[in-house]
Structures are given as structure tokens and as C-alpha cells.
């Protein structure tokens, strides 16, 4: 993956409120980009375009955390423990496939995935 191609022809897809920041999702040629609204710099995370469809198919109607996504999706190529799973949930939320719940599971954010 080349950095120049990541930023070519980006389209704004949506945004979602995290606990502390607003996250913006952009669609590029091959990837989705997640960027937090930060005052000190610019940070971008790359999410595979296949992720929203996998979340919709495997978790429709369920409440999930990033950890649950990594453990239960059976797709280590797309979801790993840590921030990649959380970024995947931010993408799902920004695209309207999920919503972030106020309720938490321990310290983890919980997302409700829309039904089929």
C-alpha cells in the first residue's frame, strides 16, 4: 500500500462520536480511512473496504465490542485485538450500520449492529 494512493480521490462517508473525539471516515480507491479530530496533528488509520460487509453479515442485531469483534469474527486478516477492531466499529457507525451505545462493558465501548 502506497501512501500517495491512500489519499487519492477520497470521499467523505460519515462521522461518529467516540468517547472523547469525533471520528471521520473517508473512502479511497481500495481502503477506508478513519481519522480522529485532533488538535495536535493528523492521524489516519486504514480499514479494509470488506470490513463493513463482514460486520453486517456476522454481527447483525448484536451488541459488540472491539474485543468481541476480534475474537468472534474469525477473520484475523481484518480484525485484530486492539485499535483495528475499534476502528472497524467506527467505520460501521459512520456508515450507519451500527450505533455506539452509552452503556459500556467494563471500559469498552459497545456498538449495536443493525439487523438484517
Predicted regions span which residues?
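Short acidic, hydrophobic short linear motifs in intrinsically disordered regions
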Residues: 46-53, 57-82
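Conserved hydrophobic residue
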Residues: 98-102
Amino acid at each position: 500500500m502506497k501512501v500517495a494512493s491512500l489519499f487519492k480521490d477520497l470521499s467523505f462517508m460519515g462521522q461518529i462520536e467516540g468517547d472523547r473525539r469525533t471520528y471521520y471516515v473517508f473512502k479511497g480507491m481500495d481502503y477506508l480511512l478513519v481519522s480522529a479530530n485532533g488538535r495536535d496533528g493528523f492521524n489516519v488509520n486504514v480499514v479494509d473496504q470488506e470490513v463493513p460487509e463482514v460486520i453486517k453479515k456476522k454481527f447483525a442485531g448484536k451488541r459488540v465490542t472491539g474485543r468481541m469483534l476480534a475474537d468472534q469474527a474469525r477473520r484475523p486478516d481484518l480484525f485484530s485485538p486492539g485499535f483495528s477492531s475499534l476502528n472497524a466499529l467506527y467505520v460501521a457507525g459512520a456508515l450507519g450500520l451500527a450505533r455506539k451505545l452509552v452503556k459500556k462493558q467494563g471500559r469498552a465501548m459497545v456498538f449495536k449492529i443493525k439487523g438484517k
